[in-house]
Protein backbone atom coordinates (compact mmCIF):
# COMPACT_ATOMS: atom_id res chain seq x y z
CA UNK A 1 0.00 0.00 0.00
CA UNK A 2 1.44 3.38 -1.01
CA UNK A 3 1.59 6.43 1.26
CA UNK A 4 -1.31 7.95 -0.69
CA UNK A 5 -3.44 4.83 -0.23
CA UNK A 6 -2.55 4.56 3.47
CA UNK A 7 -3.64 8.15 4.10
CA UNK A 8 -6.84 7.64 2.14
CA UNK A 9 -7.61 4.48 4.13
CA UNK A 10 -7.08 6.36 7.40
CA UNK A 11 -9.57 9.03 6.33
CA UNK A 12 -12.15 6.51 5.10
CA UNK A 13 -11.97 4.38 8.23
CA UNK A 14 -12.12 7.41 10.54
CA UNK A 15 -15.25 8.68 8.78
CA UNK A 16 -17.05 5.33 8.63
CA UNK A 17 -15.90 3.16 11.53
CA UNK A 18 -15.80 4.16 15.21
CA UNK A 19 -12.71 3.25 17.30
CA UNK A 20 -12.80 0.36 19.76
CA UNK A 21 -12.85 2.47 22.94
CA UNK A 22 -15.81 4.56 21.75
CA UNK A 23 -17.72 1.45 20.70
CA UNK A 24 -17.40 0.14 24.27
CA UNK A 25 -18.75 3.38 25.73
CA UNK A 26 -21.80 3.40 23.43
CA UNK A 27 -22.50 -0.26 24.17
CA UNK A 28 -22.33 0.48 27.91
CA UNK A 29 -24.55 3.56 27.54
CA UNK A 30 -27.31 1.43 26.04
CA UNK A 31 -27.37 -0.76 29.16
CA UNK A 32 -27.49 2.23 31.54
CA UNK A 33 -30.31 4.20 29.94
CA UNK A 34 -33.90 3.70 31.11
CA UNK A 35 -35.66 1.37 28.64
CA UNK A 36 -38.54 2.59 26.47
CA UNK A 37 -37.64 6.27 26.78
CA UNK A 38 -36.79 8.79 24.08
CA UNK A 39 -33.13 8.66 25.08
CA UNK A 40 -33.00 4.87 24.90
CA UNK A 41 -34.62 5.06 21.48
CA UNK A 42 -31.96 7.57 20.42
CA UNK A 43 -29.14 5.32 21.67
CA UNK A 44 -30.60 2.33 19.84
CA UNK A 45 -30.73 4.39 16.64
CA UNK A 46 -27.15 5.56 17.16
CA UNK A 47 -25.97 1.96 17.58
CA UNK A 48 -27.80 0.84 14.45
CA UNK A 49 -26.37 3.79 12.51
CA UNK A 50 -22.81 2.89 13.55
CA UNK A 51 -23.34 -0.65 12.26
CA UNK A 52 -24.83 0.59 8.98
CA UNK A 53 -21.96 3.01 8.36
CA UNK A 54 -19.33 0.35 9.01
CA UNK A 55 -21.02 -2.23 6.79
CA UNK A 56 -21.50 0.15 3.85
CA UNK A 57 -18.29 2.16 4.40
CA UNK A 58 -20.23 5.42 4.33
CA UNK A 59 -19.96 8.40 6.74
CA UNK A 60 -21.30 7.82 10.26
CA UNK A 61 -22.42 11.45 10.32
CA UNK A 62 -22.95 13.68 7.30
CA UNK A 63 -20.94 16.42 9.01
CA UNK A 64 -17.46 14.99 8.61
CA UNK A 65 -16.12 18.09 10.31
CA UNK A 66 -12.76 19.79 10.15
CA UNK A 67 -10.15 17.06 9.48
CA UNK A 68 -7.47 17.54 12.14
CA UNK A 69 -4.25 15.54 11.80
CA UNK A 70 -1.68 15.04 14.55
CA UNK A 71 1.55 13.92 12.86
CA UNK A 72 4.87 12.72 14.31
CA UNK A 73 7.77 12.04 11.94
CA UNK A 74 11.40 10.94 12.34
CA UNK A 75 14.06 13.64 12.32
CA UNK A 76 14.92 14.39 8.69
CA UNK A 77 11.63 13.12 7.23
CA UNK A 78 10.24 15.38 4.48
CA UNK A 79 7.14 16.88 6.08
CA UNK A 80 6.38 19.01 3.01
CA UNK A 81 5.86 15.90 0.89
CA UNK A 82 3.67 14.36 3.59
CA UNK A 83 1.60 17.55 3.85
CA UNK A 84 0.90 17.49 0.11
CA UNK A 85 -0.02 13.79 0.26
CA UNK A 86 -2.47 14.50 3.10
CA UNK A 87 -4.08 17.26 1.04
CA UNK A 88 -4.46 14.94 -1.94
CA UNK A 89 -5.93 12.18 0.23
CA UNK A 90 -8.47 14.61 1.72
CA UNK A 91 -9.53 15.76 -1.76
CA UNK A 92 -9.78 12.14 -2.94
CA UNK A 93 -11.93 11.15 0.04
CA UNK A 94 -14.19 14.15 -0.55
CA UNK A 95 -14.72 13.25 -4.21
CA UNK A 96 -15.54 9.67 -3.18
CA UNK A 97 -18.22 10.84 -0.73
CA UNK A 98 -16.31 9.76 2.38
CA UNK A 99 -15.98 13.39 3.48
CA UNK A 100 -18.50 16.17 2.95
CA UNK A 101 -17.07 19.31 1.31
CA UNK A 102 -16.78 21.51 4.41
CA UNK A 103 -14.18 24.16 3.53
CA UNK A 104 -15.91 27.51 3.00
CA UNK A 105 -14.35 30.88 2.17
CA UNK A 106 -15.27 33.05 5.16
CA UNK A 107 -15.56 36.21 3.04
CA UNK A 108 -17.34 35.01 -0.11
CA UNK A 109 -19.19 31.99 1.31
CA UNK A 110 -17.87 29.90 -1.59
CA UNK A 111 -17.30 26.21 -0.87
CA UNK A 112 -13.96 24.95 -2.21
CA UNK A 113 -15.60 21.61 -3.01
CA UNK A 114 -12.61 19.49 -1.98
CA UNK A 115 -12.03 20.36 1.71
CA UNK A 116 -8.87 22.28 0.81
CA UNK A 117 -8.24 25.95 1.48
CA UNK A 118 -6.57 28.32 3.94
CA UNK A 119 -6.57 26.52 7.29
CA UNK A 120 -8.12 23.28 6.02
CA UNK A 121 -7.30 20.60 6.77
CA UNK A 122 -5.59 21.25 10.11
CA UNK A 123 -2.22 19.50 10.42
CA UNK A 124 -0.03 19.56 13.54
CA UNK A 125 3.53 18.38 12.78
CA UNK A 126 5.97 17.17 15.43
CA UNK A 127 9.24 15.26 15.31
CA UNK A 128 10.23 12.23 17.36
CA UNK A 129 13.24 9.93 17.47
CA UNK A 130 11.40 6.79 16.42
CA UNK A 131 11.89 5.38 12.93
CA UNK A 132 8.19 5.48 12.13
CA UNK A 133 5.54 7.97 11.03
CA UNK A 134 2.56 8.31 13.36
CA UNK A 135 -0.59 10.00 12.03
CA UNK A 136 -3.73 10.48 14.09
CA UNK A 137 -6.94 11.99 12.76
CA UNK A 138 -10.05 13.37 14.42
CA UNK A 139 -13.17 14.47 12.53
CA UNK A 140 -15.07 16.92 14.74
CA UNK A 141 -18.28 18.32 13.27
CA UNK A 142 -19.71 21.82 13.48
CA UNK A 143 -22.55 20.97 15.86
CA UNK A 144 -20.22 19.95 18.67
CA UNK A 145 -17.56 22.50 17.67
CA UNK A 146 -20.13 25.25 18.25
CA UNK A 147 -20.61 24.01 21.84
CA UNK A 148 -16.94 24.51 22.69
CA UNK A 149 -16.65 27.07 25.45
CA UNK A 150 -13.92 29.03 27.21
CA UNK A 151 -14.11 30.46 30.71
CA UNK A 152 -12.01 33.28 32.19
CA UNK A 153 -11.85 32.87 35.97
CA UNK A 154 -13.12 34.18 38.27
CA UNK A 155 -16.53 34.05 36.60
CA UNK A 156 -20.16 33.84 37.68
CA UNK A 157 -21.91 30.75 36.31
CA UNK A 158 -25.69 30.15 36.18
CA UNK A 159 -26.78 27.78 38.91
CA UNK A 160 -23.28 27.42 40.34
CA UNK A 161 -22.26 30.89 41.50
CA UNK A 162 -18.69 32.11 41.32
CA UNK A 163 -16.02 29.88 39.83
CA UNK A 164 -12.70 30.87 41.39
CA UNK A 165 -9.13 30.33 40.20
CA UNK A 166 -8.70 26.87 41.66
CA UNK A 167 -9.56 23.25 40.92
CA UNK A 168 -13.06 23.64 42.29
CA UNK A 169 -13.62 26.59 39.98
CA UNK A 170 -12.55 24.35 37.11
CA UNK A 171 -15.03 21.71 38.32
CA UNK A 172 -17.85 24.24 38.13
CA UNK A 173 -16.82 25.23 34.61
CA UNK A 174 -16.93 21.63 33.39
CA UNK A 175 -20.34 20.97 34.91
CA UNK A 176 -21.61 24.17 33.29
CA UNK A 177 -20.03 23.18 29.95
CA UNK A 178 -22.15 20.02 29.89
CA UNK A 179 -25.28 21.93 30.90
CA UNK A 180 -24.89 24.63 28.23
CA UNK A 181 -24.41 22.04 25.47
CA UNK A 182 -27.76 20.37 26.21
CA UNK A 183 -28.53 18.18 23.17
CA UNK A 184 -27.22 20.66 20.61
CA UNK A 185 -23.79 19.04 20.46
CA UNK A 186 -25.27 15.56 19.89
CA UNK A 187 -25.06 14.21 23.42
CA UNK A 188 -24.08 11.90 24.92
CA UNK A 189 -20.75 13.64 24.48
CA UNK A 190 -17.16 13.94 25.65
CA UNK A 191 -15.09 16.81 27.05
CA UNK A 192 -11.51 17.66 26.14
CA UNK A 193 -10.29 20.27 28.63
CA UNK A 194 -7.31 22.54 29.12
CA UNK A 195 -6.65 24.39 32.36
CA UNK A 196 -4.44 27.41 31.68
CA UNK A 197 -2.52 28.50 28.62
CA UNK A 198 -3.66 31.53 26.65
CA UNK A 199 -6.89 31.72 24.66
CA UNK A 200 -5.34 30.11 21.59
CA UNK A 201 -3.16 27.42 23.17
CA UNK A 202 -5.93 26.57 25.62
CA UNK A 203 -8.40 25.59 22.92
CA UNK A 204 -5.71 23.70 20.99
CA UNK A 205 -4.61 21.73 24.06
CA UNK A 206 -8.23 20.98 24.95
CA UNK A 207 -8.80 19.46 21.52
CA UNK A 208 -5.59 17.44 21.80
CA UNK A 209 -7.03 15.75 24.91
CA UNK A 210 -9.52 14.06 22.58
CA UNK A 211 -6.65 11.95 21.23
CA UNK A 212 -6.33 10.23 24.62
CA UNK A 213 -7.90 6.78 24.88
CA UNK A 214 -11.22 6.64 26.68
CA UNK A 215 -9.96 4.19 29.32
CA UNK A 216 -6.63 5.83 30.14
CA UNK A 217 -5.87 7.27 33.58
CA UNK A 218 -4.60 10.80 33.99
CA UNK A 219 -1.08 10.66 35.52
CA UNK A 220 -1.90 13.72 37.65
CA UNK A 221 -3.92 12.42 40.61
CA UNK A 222 -6.00 15.58 41.09
CA UNK A 223 -6.94 15.64 37.40
CA UNK A 224 -7.79 11.94 37.40
CA UNK A 225 -10.15 12.58 40.31
CA UNK A 226 -11.66 15.58 38.51
CA UNK A 227 -12.26 13.58 35.32
CA UNK A 228 -14.02 10.85 37.26
CA UNK A 229 -16.12 13.36 39.21
CA UNK A 230 -17.33 15.19 36.11
CA UNK A 231 -18.42 12.05 34.26
CA UNK A 232 -20.26 10.66 37.28
CA UNK A 233 -22.04 13.88 38.19
CA UNK A 234 -22.76 15.28 34.73
CA UNK A 235 -24.89 12.19 34.21
CA UNK A 236 -27.06 13.32 37.13
CA UNK A 237 -28.14 16.48 35.28
CA UNK A 238 -30.84 14.56 33.40
CA UNK A 239 -30.05 16.01 29.96
CA UNK A 240 -29.80 12.63 28.28
CA UNK A 241 -29.00 11.57 24.74
CA UNK A 242 -29.98 14.24 22.18
CA UNK A 243 -31.18 16.36 25.12
CA UNK A 244 -34.30 14.21 25.43
CA UNK A 245 -33.84 13.79 29.19
CA UNK A 246 -32.22 10.69 30.64
CA UNK A 247 -29.40 9.07 32.54
CA UNK A 248 -26.63 9.18 29.92
CA UNK A 249 -25.36 12.68 29.12
CA UNK A 250 -21.55 12.47 29.19
CA UNK A 251 -19.36 9.53 28.15
CA UNK A 252 -15.90 10.86 28.91
CA UNK A 253 -13.79 13.76 30.21
CA UNK A 254 -10.06 14.30 29.64
CA UNK A 255 -8.23 17.21 31.29
CA UNK A 256 -4.81 18.65 30.49
CA UNK A 257 -2.98 21.59 32.02
CA UNK A 258 -0.67 24.33 30.73
CA UNK A 259 1.14 27.13 32.52
CA UNK A 260 -0.59 30.51 32.31
CA UNK A 261 0.06 34.21 32.65
CA UNK A 262 -0.43 35.64 36.17
CA UNK A 263 -3.30 37.80 34.90
CA UNK A 264 -5.13 35.01 33.07
CA UNK A 265 -6.87 31.82 34.14
CA UNK A 266 -8.64 30.22 31.20
CA UNK A 267 -10.54 26.95 31.22
CA UNK A 268 -11.03 25.82 27.63
CA UNK A 269 -13.47 23.05 26.72
CA UNK A 270 -13.66 21.12 23.45
CA UNK A 271 -17.06 19.42 23.34
CA UNK A 272 -17.15 16.23 21.25
CA UNK A 273 -20.32 14.48 20.05
CA UNK A 274 -21.22 10.81 20.50
CA UNK A 275 -19.89 10.17 16.95
CA UNK A 276 -16.31 10.42 18.20
CA UNK A 277 -14.42 9.73 14.96
CA UNK A 278 -10.77 9.36 15.87
CA UNK A 279 -8.25 6.84 14.52
CA UNK A 280 -4.52 6.63 13.90
CA UNK A 281 -1.95 4.71 11.91
CA UNK A 282 1.76 4.02 12.22
CA UNK A 283 3.47 4.00 8.82
CA UNK A 284 6.75 2.64 7.51
CA UNK A 285 8.68 5.85 6.66
CA UNK A 286 10.32 4.24 3.62
CA UNK A 287 7.26 2.70 1.95
CA UNK A 288 4.25 4.46 3.48
CA UNK A 289 2.69 1.10 4.32
CA UNK A 290 0.45 0.83 7.39
CA UNK A 291 2.41 -1.04 10.07
CA UNK A 292 -0.37 -0.95 12.67
CA UNK A 293 -3.58 0.86 13.59
CA UNK A 294 -4.16 2.94 16.71
CA UNK A 295 -7.42 2.89 18.71
CA UNK A 296 -8.23 -0.50 17.17
CA UNK A 297 -8.36 -3.61 19.37
CA UNK A 298 -8.71 -7.23 18.21
CA UNK A 299 -11.56 -7.89 20.63
CA UNK A 300 -13.58 -4.74 19.84
CA UNK A 301 -17.37 -4.85 19.77
CA UNK A 302 -18.17 -5.37 16.09
CA UNK A 303 -21.95 -5.00 16.27
CA UNK A 304 -23.54 -2.38 18.51
CA UNK A 305 -27.24 -2.62 17.64
CA UNK A 306 -29.39 -4.75 19.91
CA UNK A 307 -32.70 -3.59 18.43
CA UNK A 308 -34.19 -1.85 15.44
CA UNK A 309 -33.62 1.81 16.36
CA UNK A 310 -37.07 3.38 16.18
CA UNK A 311 -39.39 0.57 17.22
CA UNK A 312 -42.60 1.48 15.43
CA UNK A 313 -45.84 0.37 17.07
CA UNK A 314 -48.49 1.60 14.66
CA UNK A 315 -49.40 4.48 17.00
CA UNK A 316 -47.04 6.89 15.24
CA UNK A 317 -48.28 10.03 13.53
CA UNK A 318 -47.65 9.82 9.78
CA UNK A 319 -47.21 13.10 7.88
CA UNK A 320 -46.90 13.71 4.16
CA UNK A 321 -46.82 17.13 2.49
CA UNK A 322 -48.91 19.13 1.89
CA UNK A 323 -49.92 19.03 5.57
CA UNK A 324 -53.08 20.77 6.76
CA UNK A 325 -53.46 23.02 9.79
CA UNK A 326 -55.89 20.55 11.36
CA UNK A 327 -53.47 17.65 10.96
CA UNK A 328 -50.46 19.49 12.36
CA UNK A 329 -52.36 20.76 15.40
CA UNK A 330 -53.22 17.17 16.30
CA UNK A 331 -49.49 16.45 16.79
CA UNK A 332 -48.23 16.79 20.36
CA UNK A 333 -44.78 17.03 21.88
CA UNK A 334 -43.63 13.50 22.65
CA UNK A 335 -45.28 11.91 19.61
CA UNK A 336 -43.22 9.74 17.30
CA UNK A 337 -43.75 11.24 13.84
CA UNK A 338 -42.94 9.44 10.59
CA UNK A 339 -42.46 11.50 7.43
CA UNK A 340 -43.21 10.17 3.95
CA UNK A 341 -42.99 12.01 0.63
CA UNK A 342 -41.09 15.21 -0.15
CA UNK A 343 -38.85 17.11 2.27
CA UNK A 344 -36.72 20.13 1.34
CA UNK A 345 -33.38 20.71 3.03
CA UNK A 346 -32.44 24.17 4.24
CA UNK A 347 -29.54 25.33 6.39
CA UNK A 348 -27.92 28.68 7.18
CA UNK A 349 -27.51 29.98 3.62
CA UNK A 350 -31.01 28.92 2.54
CA UNK A 351 -32.66 30.52 5.57
CA UNK A 352 -30.86 33.81 5.07
CA UNK A 353 -31.67 33.77 1.35
CA UNK A 354 -35.35 33.00 1.90
CA UNK A 355 -35.70 36.00 4.20
CA UNK A 356 -35.17 38.22 1.15
CA UNK A 357 -36.22 36.06 -1.83
CA UNK A 358 -38.93 33.67 -2.97
CA UNK A 359 -38.51 29.91 -2.82
CA UNK A 360 -37.82 27.97 -6.03
CA UNK A 361 -40.40 25.39 -4.87
CA UNK A 362 -43.82 25.71 -3.23
CA UNK A 363 -43.29 25.38 0.52
CA UNK A 364 -46.95 25.68 1.59
CA UNK A 365 -47.75 22.74 3.87
CA UNK A 366 -44.20 21.43 3.45
CA UNK A 367 -41.52 19.80 5.58
CA UNK A 368 -38.21 21.67 5.92
CA UNK A 369 -35.17 19.65 6.97
CA UNK A 370 -32.13 21.22 8.64
CA UNK A 371 -29.62 19.02 6.84
CA UNK A 372 -26.44 19.31 4.79
CA UNK A 373 -26.20 15.89 3.12
CA UNK A 374 -23.27 14.10 1.54
CA UNK A 375 -24.05 13.78 -2.17
CA UNK A 376 -22.31 12.07 -5.08
CA UNK A 377 -23.24 12.02 -8.77
CA UNK A 378 -24.28 8.83 -10.53
CA UNK A 379 -22.96 8.12 -14.06
CA UNK A 380 -26.31 9.25 -15.52
CA UNK A 381 -26.03 12.65 -13.83
CA UNK A 382 -28.56 11.93 -11.08
CA UNK A 383 -27.67 12.34 -7.42
CA UNK A 384 -27.07 9.71 -4.75
CA UNK A 385 -27.53 10.60 -1.09
CA UNK A 386 -24.63 9.17 0.91
CA UNK A 387 -25.45 10.60 4.36
CA UNK A 388 -28.35 12.71 5.60
CA UNK A 389 -28.58 13.31 9.34
CA UNK A 390 -29.84 16.56 10.91
CA UNK A 391 -27.77 19.63 11.70
CA UNK A 392 -28.09 21.76 14.85
CA UNK A 393 -31.21 23.89 14.54
CA UNK A 394 -30.36 26.70 16.95
CA UNK A 395 -28.42 28.53 14.23
CA UNK A 396 -31.69 29.14 12.40
CA UNK A 397 -33.44 30.65 15.43
CA UNK A 398 -33.19 34.25 14.11
CA UNK A 399 -34.98 33.23 10.89
CA UNK A 400 -37.20 30.22 11.52
CA UNK A 401 -40.45 31.79 12.72
CA UNK A 402 -40.36 34.33 9.88
CA UNK A 403 -39.69 31.63 7.29
CA UNK A 404 -42.52 29.47 8.63
CA UNK A 405 -44.94 32.39 8.44
CA UNK A 406 -43.79 33.63 5.05
CA UNK A 407 -44.02 30.28 3.24
CA UNK A 408 -46.56 28.27 5.27
CA UNK A 409 -44.17 25.51 6.34
CA UNK A 410 -45.84 22.96 8.62
CA UNK A 411 -42.94 20.90 9.98
CA UNK A 412 -39.27 21.60 10.65
CA UNK A 413 -36.87 18.69 11.19
CA UNK A 414 -33.55 19.22 12.94
CA UNK A 415 -31.73 18.43 16.16
CA UNK A 416 -31.15 20.13 19.48
CA UNK A 417 -34.36 22.15 19.47
CA UNK A 418 -35.10 25.83 18.97
CA UNK A 419 -35.93 28.83 21.12
CA UNK A 420 -38.78 31.01 22.26
CA UNK A 421 -39.20 32.95 19.00
CA UNK A 422 -39.61 29.76 16.98
CA UNK A 423 -41.97 28.29 19.58
CA UNK A 424 -44.22 31.34 19.26
CA UNK A 425 -44.07 30.98 15.48
CA UNK A 426 -45.14 27.34 15.70
CA UNK A 427 -48.16 28.38 17.76
CA UNK A 428 -49.09 31.33 15.57
CA UNK A 429 -48.76 29.65 12.20
CA UNK A 430 -49.57 26.03 13.04
CA UNK A 431 -46.32 24.06 12.76
CA UNK A 432 -44.18 21.60 14.71
CA UNK A 433 -40.50 20.94 15.35
CA UNK A 434 -39.39 17.34 14.86
CA UNK A 435 -36.14 16.14 16.41
CA UNK A 436 -34.26 13.60 14.32
CA UNK A 437 -31.37 11.67 15.89
CA UNK A 438 -28.20 13.71 15.44
CA UNK A 439 -25.34 11.93 13.72
CA UNK A 440 -27.56 9.10 12.43
CA UNK A 441 -26.63 9.87 8.83
CA UNK A 442 -26.91 6.31 7.50
CA UNK A 443 -30.15 5.58 9.33
CA UNK A 444 -31.75 8.58 7.63
CA UNK A 445 -30.07 8.33 4.23
CA UNK A 446 -31.54 4.83 4.06
CA UNK A 447 -34.96 6.54 4.15
CA UNK A 448 -34.15 8.65 1.07
CA UNK A 449 -35.63 6.84 -1.91
CA UNK A 450 -34.83 9.51 -4.49
CA UNK A 451 -33.23 12.92 -4.95
CA UNK A 452 -35.80 14.89 -6.95
CA UNK A 453 -33.77 18.06 -7.45
CA UNK A 454 -31.39 20.66 -6.09
CA UNK A 455 -31.42 24.47 -6.00
CA UNK A 456 -28.62 26.99 -5.36
CA UNK A 457 -25.92 24.32 -5.63
CA UNK A 458 -23.48 26.57 -7.48
CA UNK A 459 -24.09 29.49 -5.14
CA UNK A 460 -24.04 27.69 -1.80
CA UNK A 461 -22.23 24.35 -2.32
CA UNK A 462 -23.38 20.84 -1.42
CA UNK A 463 -24.04 21.24 2.33
CA UNK A 464 -25.92 24.55 2.02
CA UNK A 465 -27.91 23.94 -1.17
CA UNK A 466 -31.65 23.23 -1.07
CA UNK A 467 -32.11 19.54 -1.86
CA UNK A 468 -35.51 18.05 -2.62
CA UNK A 469 -35.55 14.56 -1.13
CA UNK A 470 -38.21 11.90 -1.42
CA UNK A 471 -38.32 9.89 1.81
CA UNK A 472 -40.14 6.91 3.26
CA UNK A 473 -40.37 5.95 6.93
CA UNK A 474 -38.35 8.96 8.16
CA UNK A 475 -38.84 8.63 11.94
CA UNK A 476 -38.56 11.58 14.35
CA UNK A 477 -39.81 12.75 17.74
CA UNK A 478 -41.96 15.88 18.03
CA UNK A 479 -40.27 17.99 20.69
CA UNK A 480 -42.01 21.34 20.05
CA UNK A 481 -45.66 21.55 19.04
CA UNK A 482 -48.19 24.18 17.97
CA UNK A 483 -49.64 24.41 21.50
CA UNK A 484 -46.62 25.94 23.22
CA UNK A 485 -45.05 22.73 24.50
CA UNK A 486 -41.27 22.32 24.28
CA UNK A 487 -39.31 19.33 25.57
CA UNK A 488 -36.08 21.33 25.13
CA UNK A 489 -37.32 24.16 27.37
CA UNK A 490 -38.41 21.65 30.00
CA UNK A 491 -35.11 19.72 30.01
CA UNK A 492 -33.11 22.95 30.13
CA UNK A 493 -35.08 24.10 33.18
CA UNK A 494 -34.86 20.78 35.02
CA UNK A 495 -31.13 20.36 34.29
CA UNK A 496 -30.42 23.92 35.48
CA UNK A 497 -32.15 23.05 38.74
CA UNK A 498 -30.04 19.90 39.05
CA UNK A 499 -26.90 21.91 38.25
CA UNK A 500 -27.56 24.02 41.33
CA UNK A 501 -27.00 20.94 43.51
CA UNK A 502 -23.31 21.11 42.59
CA UNK A 503 -22.66 24.68 43.74
CA UNK A 504 -20.97 23.72 47.02
CA UNK A 505 -17.17 23.21 47.00
CA UNK A 506 -15.83 19.71 46.41
CA UNK A 507 -12.08 20.16 45.83
CA UNK A 508 -11.39 22.72 48.56
CA UNK A 509 -11.14 26.50 48.44
Where are these regions (language model features)?
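Non-transmembrane, aqueous-exposed alpha-helical and coiled segments at domain scale
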Residues: 1-193, 198-310, 403-405
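Glycine-rich beta-strand-to-loop/alpha-helix junction loops that act as flexible
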Residues: 191-198, 340-341, 415, 438
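Feature captures the catalytic cores and cofactor-binding loops of soluble hydro-lyases/lyases
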Residues: 212-245, 345-474
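C-terminal binding/interaction regions
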Residues: 245-253, 260-262, 446-509
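Short, well-ordered loop/turn sites that connect or cap secondary structure elements
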Residues: 330-331, 337
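Short, charged beta-turn/beta-strand-edge "cap" motif at the junction between a beta-strand
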Residues: 336, 342-346
